[in-house]
Every structure is written in C-alpha cells, then in structure tokens.
Amino acid sequence: MSENKQPEQNQDLTGEPSPEELEAAQAADEFDAMNAASEAQAQLAVLQAKNTELSDNYLRAKAEAENARRRAEDEISKARKFALESFAESLLPVLDSLEAGLNMKEATLEQLREGSQATLKQLKAALERNKVIEINPVAGSKFDPHQHQAISMVPAAQEANTVVAVLQKGYLIAERVLRPALVTVAAPQ
C-alpha cells in the first residue's frame, strides 16, 4: 500500500496565507492587544492609587506644617506674655516699698535715705532676676562702641579711646544692649 500524501484541498499553493491563517493571526494580534491594554489599565490603576496616596500624604504634611507653625506662634505669644508677667511681678515689691515710703508722714531724712537704698536694692535684684545687667565701665577701660556711647572726647592723661567717666550707666538684657552707657572718652594727644 502506498501512502501518497495528497495536498490538502484548502492549501494555497501561491505561498500566501490562507484566510484561516489570517483569521488566526488577527485573533492572536487582537488577543495580544487586549492583554497589553489590560496591563496598561492595571498599571494606570496602580499609578492612580499611588498618585492619590501621595496627594493625601502631601495634604497631611502641609496641614501638619501649618499646625506646627500655629503652635509655635502661640508658644511665642505665651512666652512673651508670661515673660512680661514675670518681669512685672518682680517689680511689685519695689512699687510696694515706694508707696510705703510715700505714706510715711513723719519720716526723717535718714529714714528716707535708708528706705530709698532698700528700694534701690530691691529694684536691682528684680532686674538681675530678669537678666538685666548693668553696663558701668571703669575709668581707663577700652571704649566699646557696642556697649558705650561717647558723649564727648576730653583731654586726659590716659590712653586715647579709653573711658574717662561714666555719665549714665547702660544696661544689657539677655546679652543685648538695652541702653548703652553714656561716657566721656580720652582724646588722642
């Protein structure tokens, strides 16, 4: 028995694909396109979710920063208020002493002097507690333009640009000049 292969009846002898092959290829292309589209849609959904998450995180961080700024402003405001309150409270004993001195009807000059000295001592203590420090340069010390204000230059036997006399004490508060000391300075010779 001889087996002869006979060409299939549907086979195209021209070398071009048959309609069934074209249909199968087209179906495969459509399937690949559908897979690519569904993958793209899945990636898009993932990216949209990530975008939403990042947007939410940004808004939360922005709100948290705004809240932190408000809290800081409130704390600064309270610190100023309470610092002023503390300073005023430390001056109340001085006020009490001055009022008591003024209420004395038959005070002697010596009693007034002692009362004034005690009140001055109270005032200096209150200023020290609140970090107000006296600037009182000694004669002959170097002139410091950051803490001293020269009122005049006078001829003196000491080195030029040194303090000759203090006309009015200055004050620092927390290492910042509240008022410079008014001084006379030795003139160059």
Curated annotation (Swiss-Prot):
PROSITE patterns: GRPE
Localization per Swiss-Prot or TrEMBL: Cytoplasm
GO biological process: protein folding
Family matches, as SUPFAM superfamilies: Coiled-coil domain of nucleotide exchange factor GrpE, Head domain of nucleotide exchange factor GrpE
Top-level taxon in the UniProt lineage: Bacteria
NCBIfam families: PRK14139.1, PRK14140.1, PRK14150.1
Name of the protein described by the UniProt record: Protein GrpE
Annotated GO CC locations: cytosol
Gene name as annotated: grpE
Family affiliation: Belongs to the GrpE family.
Keywords per UniProt: Chaperone, Cytoplasm, Stress response
Entry-linked Gene3D superfamilies: 3.90.20.20, Head domain of nucleotide exchange factor GrpE
Organism: Polaromonas naphthalenivorans (strain CJ2)
MF-aspect GO terms: adenyl-nucleotide exchange factor activity; protein homodimerization activity; protein-folding chaperone binding; unfolded protein binding
Record's compositionally biased regions (Polar residues): 1-13
Biological function: Participates actively in the response to hyperosmotic and heat shock by preventing the aggregation of stress-denatured proteins, in association with DnaK and GrpE. It is the nucleotide exchange factor for DnaK and may function as a thermosensor. Unfolded proteins bind initially to DnaJ; upon interaction with the DnaJ-bound protein, DnaK hydrolyzes its bound ATP, resulting in the formation of a stable complex. GrpE releases ADP from DnaK; ATP binding to DnaK triggers the release of the substrate protein, thus completing the reaction cycle.
Disulfide bond positions: none
